[in-house]
């Protein structure tokens, strides 16, 4: 995943937020302004204690950082990478899935990035939406909630099951809806004020595909 793709996708992603609810979108910039995000892996982004030769170090500090985590315990992707069990992969420690080093906490630990908005996308590939929906992954939801609570100075844009209607994700619509709701309710029940959840369709989806998951 390269930095240019991350910037382009996040500008589009944020634009969707603003147009979807221009009167009440949480963390929206003032009219006429946009937030630029950089990502999508630690090495490409830079600005952390371990990785210091990326976008942040060579171009400048963006308005936000884009990052991905997985709720997919024990699942193996097409590159032969098996995801961690017992924790949200890519959230509190560094890992890699054949797309660069991934560690969200590294950005939060960096004084350089102390004013950045955090975009956190959650993947539930490998039919993991079923386990989120039925409560089997409640320990992962708790880890996510604790993470957001522990960093109240940073706004989080949480994109649950991003591109949910894309064929590459193969999410079951009823279980996806339940999984999305379960994560949102946990964040709301914790009375956190530093997050907004994002319902993000894939760019090529038809209205009929979108409605299946709505």
List where the protein language model places each region:
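Bacterial N-terminal signal peptides
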Residues: 7-15
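Coiled-coil-like amphipathic alpha-helices with heptad-repeat character
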Residues: 14-17, 154
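Active-site cleft segment of glycoside hydrolase catalytic domains centered on the general acid/base Glu
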Residues: 130-214
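N-terminal carbohydrate-binding/catalytic regions of secreted carbohydrate-active enzymes
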Residues: 33-151
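Bacterial N-terminal signal peptides that target proteins for export
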Residues: 1-6
